[in-house]
């Protein structure tokens, strides 16, 4: 049988063309140090800042320090199973996280992995954890209100969709309660909420999740948790992971509320990592870029222009103060980044004023534009009235001889303080907030004993629901007050049916 050379050569060519090697080319290095959530590796000469690397045990890390001889890596997982001498390879990718509607109702860690025992998650969509904030021309002014359901906030320091409003105060002053109430009030408002718990006890996070689940708020909420027992790198990236999840909804024309509880612990985790990576310390041993740590996160919250779908992401960052010191380093940084702050005061909290909002120190720099007309009319002078009441109250300690006008101001002020109190997890619809504030500012509460104000409020709401629902509907539909004569008449009718 004759051997045909051309057939053999064509077969060999085909074999060569179809040959695929079963190996991959990757730049690898060797771990020279590991501990406390960081690793150093020699040999990754072309690694880029923020690039993901993979250790030989499958754990991922992120390149942070690019030194002349080695690379400083933060370990995104269990660093205890990594040993000196292990190999580490570049992946050529940046860190991405799962995003999408499948996350709603779930509790996940900062890597997007579920920790609630409700099964695996595979959304099929990812977004980079670190993303560039929208530019000036991609945004528009804050114009829609975000109702928190808390009278003290919606009246005195209103928040708009797309705003960044800092919640600041000592530990145990009700910061988390304010945010949970704001989340509860988004039910039926076409809003998706993301609660990012940073450095909290796992038992505390579980309690918050159970509260949200019991009150049906998990139907529109995602919880991202990096608990106190987890390594610092996870606490550092948790807020960015929450922001990435929110951006997916925002860029699809939806409205998102993201709560960062709290950024003080993220700053501490970042300080720890920076010192371990041998970066030069600055004030209070924080690294020089700690301002950028928070500014690049909070700038991602925005109200997008109509061309981009008009979606929004509202941020409620928390900062924990020490003994009410709002002039501390991290506190002043975040105050300067955000569009206002709500200051919760220890003394008010312990005197029974809850939420313990200090009207004098709290401000909203852009939310006023988003406040509904009805609320603007009834709450316009409330801040000033409350501030002058606090001042007068301090003076009355020195003497009891007061003229009638001063006495009237004090009486109105005491009732204002009572009206702004609110029970936990009982957010109030905006039309009912307007109603009670109208009654207060138009003198209908002046003859009601201070101790009975909250009882008066509850009974008045029930009375209006039963007999004057049309007046409440006018506020809901038109966002403006109904005829004042009709409102006055209805409130008087209620007072005639009671002992007030």
Swiss-Prot record:
It catalyses: ATP + H2O + 4 H(+)(in) = ADP + phosphate + 5 H(+)(out). The record marks 362 as: Required for activity. InterPro entries: ATP_synth_asu-like_sf, ATP_synth_asu_C, ATP_synth_asu_C_sf, ATP_synth_F1_a_nt-bd_dom, ATP_synth_F1_asu, ATPase_F1/V1/A1_a/bsu_N, ATPase_F1/V1/A1_a/bsu_N_sf, ATPase_F1/V1/A1_a/bsu_nucl-bd. This is ATP synthase subunit alpha. It is an enzyme of class 7 (translocase). Pfam families: ATP-synt_ab (PF00006), ATP-synt_ab_C (PF00306), ATP-synt_ab_N (PF02874). Gene3D superfamilies: 2.40.30.20, ATP synthase alpha/beta chain, C-terminal domain (1.20.150.20), P-loop containing nucleotide triphosphate hydrolases (3.40.50.300). One of its GO terms (molecular function) is ADP binding. ATP binds at residues 169-176. Transmembrane segments: none annotated. Keywords: ATP synthesis, ATP-binding, Cell membrane, CF(1), Hydrogen ion transport, Ion transport, Membrane, Nucleotide-binding, Translocase, Transport. It is a peripheral membrane protein. The gene is atpA. F-type ATPases have 2 components, CF(1) - the catalytic core - and CF(0) - the membrane proton channel. CF(1) has five subunits: alpha(3), beta(3), gamma(1), delta(1), epsilon(1). CF(0) has three main subunits: a(1), b(2) and c(9-12). The alpha and beta chains form an alternating ring which encloses part of the gamma chain. CF(1) is attached to CF(0) by a central stalk formed by the gamma and epsilon chains, while a peripheral stalk is formed by the delta and b chains. GO terms for cellular component: plasma membrane; proton-transporting ATP synthase complex. NCBIfam families: atpA (TIGR00962), PRK13343.1 (NF009884). Belongs to the ATPase alpha/beta chains family. CDD domains: ATP-synt_F1_alpha_C, ATP-synt_F1_alpha_N, F1-ATPase_alpha_CD. It is found in: Cell membrane. Its EC number is 7.1.2.2. Produces ATP from ADP in the presence of a proton gradient across the membrane. The alpha chain is a regulatory subunit.
């Amino acid at each position: 049988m004759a051997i045909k050379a051309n057939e053999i050569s064509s077969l060999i060519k085909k074999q060569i063309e179809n040959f695929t090697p079963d190996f991959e080319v990757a730049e690898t290095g060797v771990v020279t140090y590991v501990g406390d959530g960081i690793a150093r590796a020699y040999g990754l000469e072309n690694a880029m800042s923020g690039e993901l690397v993979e250790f030989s045990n499958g754990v991922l890390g992120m390149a942070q320090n690019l030194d002349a001889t080695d690379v400083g890596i933060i370990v995104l997982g269990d660093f205890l199973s990594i040993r000196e001498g292990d190999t580490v390879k570049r992946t050529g990718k940046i860190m991405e996280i799962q995003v999408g509607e499948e996350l709603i109702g779930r509790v996940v860690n900062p890597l997007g992995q579920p920790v609630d025992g409700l099964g695996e998650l595979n959304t099929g969509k990812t977004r980079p954890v670190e993303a560039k904030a929208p530019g000036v021309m991609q945004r528009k002014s804050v114009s829609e209100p975000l109702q928190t359901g808390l009278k003290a906030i919606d009246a005195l320091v209103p928040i708009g969709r797309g705003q960044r409003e800092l919640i600041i105060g000592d530990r145990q002053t009700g910061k988390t309660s304010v945010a949970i109430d704001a989340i509860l009030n988004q039910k039926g408002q076409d809003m998706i909420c993301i609660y990012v718990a940073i450095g909290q006890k796992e038992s505390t996070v579980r309690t918050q999740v159970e509260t949200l689940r019991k009150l049906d708020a998990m139907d529109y909420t995602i919880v991202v948790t990096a608990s106190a027992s987890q390594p610092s790198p996870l606490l550092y990236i948790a807020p960015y992971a929450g922001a990435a999840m929110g951006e997916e909804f925002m860029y699809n024309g939806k409205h998102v509320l993201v709560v960062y509880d709290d950024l003080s612990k993220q700053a501490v985790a970042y300080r720890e990592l920076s010192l371990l990576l041998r970066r030069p310390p600055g004030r209070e041993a924080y690294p020089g870029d700690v301002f950028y740590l928070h500014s690049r996160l909070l700038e991602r919250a925005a109200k997008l222009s109509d061309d981009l779908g008009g979606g929004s992401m509202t941020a409620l960052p928390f900062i924990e103060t020490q003994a009410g010191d709002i002039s501390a380093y991290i506190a002043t940084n975040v105050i300067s980044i955000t569009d206002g702050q709500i200051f919760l005061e220890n003394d008010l909290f312990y005197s029974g004023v809850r939420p313990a909002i200090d009207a004098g120190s709290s401000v909203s720099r852009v939310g006023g534009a988003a406040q509904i007309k009805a609320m603007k009319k009834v709450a316009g002078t409330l801040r000033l009235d409350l501030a002058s009441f606090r001042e007068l109250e301090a003076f009355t300690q020195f003497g009891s001889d007061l003229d009638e006008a001063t006495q009237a101001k004090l009486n109105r002020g005491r009732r204002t303080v009572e009206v702004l109190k609110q029970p936990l997890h009982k957010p109030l619809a905006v039309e009912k907030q307007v109603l009670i504030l109208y009654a207060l500012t138009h003198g209908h509460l002046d003859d009601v004993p201070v101790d009975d104000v909250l009882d008066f409020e509850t009974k008045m709401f029930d009375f209006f629901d039963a007999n004057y629902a049309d007046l409440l509907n006018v506020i809901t539909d038109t966002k403006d007050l109904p005829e004042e004569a009709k409102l006055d008449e209805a409130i008087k009718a209620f007072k005639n049916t009671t002992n007030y």
